[in-house]
């Protein structure tokens, strides 16, 4: 084996030289230069000072504006809550460990950090699945006269938490485990060892199938059908001007949604799958560190994509930040009517399928 396995860790370096140390007790500067740990700490600090305000503002603005308390926005708020879980439960911990060069909070802290990071990421992922299904049902109309109400939104939010817990909780109770990964400053699922006594292989397979492949398939299917439906409606010149605008807006949103998801999670999932399929092979600590830390940026991407691109949310945010006045209101007044019609077309199922 080209790594060193301990009771609750796996360091991707052979201990033939005798330099490998427990990542819960000793700095890991033998894995990489000091400046790399400093870069990780700076990156986590950036995610905290940007991710927290944007996600907190999403919650605050929704509470302040009654018109935003719509069923669909329950899911968007769930995304913000999930991202805050990642910020407080994962990012702050990783910032401190990166500054110290090792996981100073011990095995228990590793379990908590891994749990909250996984929970937040999975809530975000399944929230996107619920959004995709809602968009598909409302716009493509596979069921006639369906209206997405509060009960559907609450059920969707509940589903995200159930599925997230089904992924994040098992390693805490003996099915797989959380261990430090990469430069040993953040924790994740053990992809590195078979560990038969905790049935690690079966859990990793379960996680990749149920909590990655299936959600990704659903998202691609729903948004693929949505784009086709909007294009067909536009081609038939149904409500031509607003539908054409809706087509452009929805297409742009879908492209950014898919790209954002893939940019955040596909590199991490691909590297994790490679490591899992090649356990014991030689790879450096940076090999997993970069995609692992890059996946954490989803806490910043999500609100920018799903909240800030929503005109109603954006206007309410500007009004809140500017103490009740929107300085851009006059500039947008000429398109306000069209925007409302567009929102109705896309969000209230007025865009008819072919």
UniProtKB/Swiss-Prot annotation:
One MF term in the entry's GO annotations: 11-cis retinal binding
Recorded topology in the membrane: Multi-pass membrane protein
Location of the motif 'Ionic lock' involved in activated form stabilization: 134-136
PROSITE patterns with a match to the protein in the record: G_PROTEIN_RECEP_F1_1 (PS00237), G_PROTEIN_RECEP_F1_2 (PS50262), OPSIN (PS00238)
Stretches of the chain found on the membrane's Extracellular side: 1-36, 97-110, 174-202, 275-286
GO cellular component: membrane; photoreceptor disc membrane; plasma membrane
Protein name in UniProt: Rhodopsin
Naturally occurring in which organism (per UniProt): Galeus melastomus (Blackmouth catshark)
């Amino acid at each position: 084996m080209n790594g060193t396995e301990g009771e609750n860790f796996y360091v991707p370096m052979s201990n033939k030289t005798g330099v490998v140390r427990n990542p819960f007790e000793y700095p890991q500067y033998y894995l990489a230069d000091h400046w790399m740990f400093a870069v990780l700490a700076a990156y986590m600090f950036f995610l905290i000072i940007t991710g927290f305000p944007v996600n907190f503002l999403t919650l605050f603005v929704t509470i302040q504006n009654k018109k935003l308390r719509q069923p669909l926005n329950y899911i968007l708020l769930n995304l913000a809550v999930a991202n805050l879980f990642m910020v407080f439960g994962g990012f702050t911990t990783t910032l401190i460990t990166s500054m110290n060069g090792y996981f100073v909070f011990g095995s228990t802290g590793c379990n908590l950090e891994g749990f909250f990071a996984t929970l937040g990421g999975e809530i975000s992922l399944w929230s996107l699945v619920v959004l995709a299904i809602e968009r598909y049902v409302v716009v493509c109309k596979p069921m006639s006269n369906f209206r997405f109400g509060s009960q559907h939104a609450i059920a969707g939010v509940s589903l995200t938490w159930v599925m997230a817990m089904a992924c994040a909780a098992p390693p805490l109770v003996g099915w797989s485990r959380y261990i430090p990964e990469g430069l040993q400053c953040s924790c994740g699922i053990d992809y590195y060892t078979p560990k038969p006594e905790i049935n690690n292989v079966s859990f990793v397979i379960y996680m990749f199938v149920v909590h990655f492949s299936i959600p990704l398939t659903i998202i691609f299917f729903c948004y693929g059908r949505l784009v086709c439906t909007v294009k067909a409606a536009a081609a038939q010149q149904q409500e031509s001007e607003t539908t054409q605008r809706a087509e452009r807006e929805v297409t742009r949103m879908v492209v950014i949604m898919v790209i954002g998801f893939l940019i955040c999670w596909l590199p991490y999932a691909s590297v994790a799958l490679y490591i899992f399929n090649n356990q014991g092979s030689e790879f450096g600590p940076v090999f997993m560190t970069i995609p692992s830390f890059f996946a954490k940026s989803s806490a910043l991407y999500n609100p920018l994509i799903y909240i800030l691109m929503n005109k109603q949310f954006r206007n309410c945010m500007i009004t809140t930040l500017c103490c009740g006045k929107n300085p851009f209101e006059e500039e947008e007044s000429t398109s306000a009517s069209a925007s409302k019609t567009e929102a109705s077309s896309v969000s209230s199922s007025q865009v008819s399928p072919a």
